[in-house]
């Protein structure tokens, strides 16, 4: 989508809600004007976009979300976390407890969209669409609150901080916000999927994320006298090549793994062999056994290559989110909801990006969707944008998904 589109809309909404006649709540006792709601959600998203905040620093974002919820009479839950908002919407009748989650943090990126509502915080941008996620969940919350009396169970809203830091979900779990919850639903915008389309897949959808840093210690020497030292540059070069054989020769070719060295640093001048070289990178996998296999081989290969060149290697390994694996039963119910919302459902290709929503799925069943937003640039790009007509559709999708799980006659798949 061209920047001309975004520049033209300014603060107005010259378009009609795409397919507004199919986004209807007329079967409910409390009908909602979705055209009005759409404009409200676009305004919310633009406010969030102008005032992005980094992981663990989402103080104004937290206050804004609380204000939006309190204005609708939605009950805020207590929390020991400094940022993030958690709330409940309980129906009149008993039933499962379902969580809906959106992440709220931004990235340390200087925005280059040229939008009239671009970030006002220098060097910080919602370049992964978490403003979209937050607005969409607020919209779903408003719809659920309007129809609270008809809910057959309870909805918990998780406005999660620090997803980009990789551990926000674990803090939410430690805070007890998943206690008593039977299933969890989330989504992520996808700029390469058209608006009106949702990607749903059982099993692995996003990769486990591991990060490594290896400091290779040698003995410095004059470049003209290499025999007087132990060259860590040679060792690092050999190690980088050898590490690639883990994927090509150790991992089953029917499985999937990525090992990338993204940084190498060593030496300060042209005629001196340095004492140390540091390499850093990441491993991505979709299977826990493969993840462990790659890690074990990584340490073994690093030790052996270093020893071969009389070097010492110090490895720091950071384990990030596990593979994100969607539950079959829950995903089936969410697929039903997507069809009811008149969305096109596709089977998406798994993404090698990571998502800490996976931590929730280690505790309770759930489903995570890719939601089409039709942008020109991928996540974390300084010109990243979303098509705002997707916001109301995402809200309605989350609303219908929550309702479908609550209304399901197959509650044994959700709760005991």
Curated annotation (Swiss-Prot):
It catalyses: N-acetyl-L-cysteine + H2O = L-cysteine + acetate. Involved in a cysteine salvage pathway from S-alkylcysteine. Catalyzes the last step in this pathway, i.e. the deacetylation of N-acetyl-L-cysteine. This pathway is likely important in the catabolism of alkylated cysteine generated by proteolysis of alkylated glutathione formed in the detoxification of a wide range of electrophiles. Keywords: Cobalt, Hydrolase, Metal-binding, Zinc. NCBIfam families: amidohydrolases. Pfam families: M20_dimer, Peptidase_M20. Zn(2+) 2 binds at residues 128, 130, 188. Binds 2 divalent metal cations per subunit. Is most efficient with Zn(2+) and Co(2+), has only a small activity with Ni(2+) and Mn(2+) and no activity with Mg(2+), Fe(3+), and Fe(2+). Pathway: Amino-acid metabolism. It comes from Bacillus subtilis (strain 168). This is N-acetyl-L-cysteine deacetylase. Zn(2+) 1 binds at residues 128, 164, 380. Its cofactor is Zn(2+); Co(2+). It is an enzyme of class 3 (hydrolase). InterPro entries: Amidohydrolase (IPR017439), Bact_exopeptidase_dim_dom (IPR036264), Peptidase_M20 (IPR002933), Peptidase_M20_dimer (IPR011650), YxeP-like (IPR033846). CDD domains: M20_Acy1_YxeP-like.
């Amino acid at each position: 989508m061209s920047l001309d589109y975004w520049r033209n809309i300014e603060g107005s909404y010259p378009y009609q809600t795409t397919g507004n006649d199919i986004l209807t709540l007329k079967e409910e006792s409390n009908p909602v004007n979705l055209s009005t709601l759409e404009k409200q959600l676009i305004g919310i998203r633009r406010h969030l976009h102008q005032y992005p905040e980094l992981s663990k620093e989402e103080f104004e974002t937290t206050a804004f979300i609380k204000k939006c919820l309190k204005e609708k009479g939605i009950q805020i839950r207590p929390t020991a976390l400094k940022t993030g908002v958690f709330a409940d919407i309980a129906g009149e009748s008993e039933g499962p407890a379902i969580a809906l989650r959106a992440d709220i943090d931004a990235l340390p990126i200087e925005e280059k969209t040229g939008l009239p509502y671009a970030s006002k915080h220098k060097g910080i941008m919602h370049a992964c669409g978490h403003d979209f996620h937050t607005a969409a969940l607020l919209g779903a919350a408003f719809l659920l609150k309007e129809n609270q009396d008809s809910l057959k169970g309870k909805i918990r809203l998780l406005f999660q901080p620090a997803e980009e830091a990789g551990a926000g979900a674990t803090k939410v779990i430690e805070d007890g916000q998943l206690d008593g919850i039977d299933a969890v639903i989330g989504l992520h915008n996808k700029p390469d999927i058209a608006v009106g389309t949702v990607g749903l897949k059982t099993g692995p959808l996003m990769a486990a994320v591991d990060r490594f840093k290896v400091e290779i210690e040698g003995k410095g020497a004059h470049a003209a006298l290499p025999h007087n030292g132990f060259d860590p540059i040679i060792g690092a070069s050999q190690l980088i090549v050898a590490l690639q054989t883990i994927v090509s020769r150790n991992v089953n070719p029917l499985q999937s793994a990525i090992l990338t060295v993204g940084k190498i640093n060593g030496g300060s001048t042209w005629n001196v062999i340095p004492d140390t070289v540091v390499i850093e990178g990441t491993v991505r996998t979709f299977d826990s056994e493969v993840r462990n296999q790659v890690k074990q081989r990584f340490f073994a290969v690093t030790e052996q290559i270093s020893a071969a060149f009389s070097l010492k290697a110090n490895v720091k390994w950071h384990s990030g989110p596990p593979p994100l694996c969607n539950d079959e039963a829950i995903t089936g119910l969410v697929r039903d909801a997507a069809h009811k919302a008149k969305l096109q459902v596709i089977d998406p290709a798994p993404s090698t990006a990571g998502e800490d929503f996976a931590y929730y799925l280690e505790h309770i069943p759930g489903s995570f969707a890719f939601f089409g937003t039709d942008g020109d640039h991928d996540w974390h790009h300084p010109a990243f944008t979303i098509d705002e007509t997707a916001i109301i559709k995402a809200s309605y999708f989350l609303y219908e998904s929550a309702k479908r799980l609550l209304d399901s006659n197959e509650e044994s798949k959700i709760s005991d």
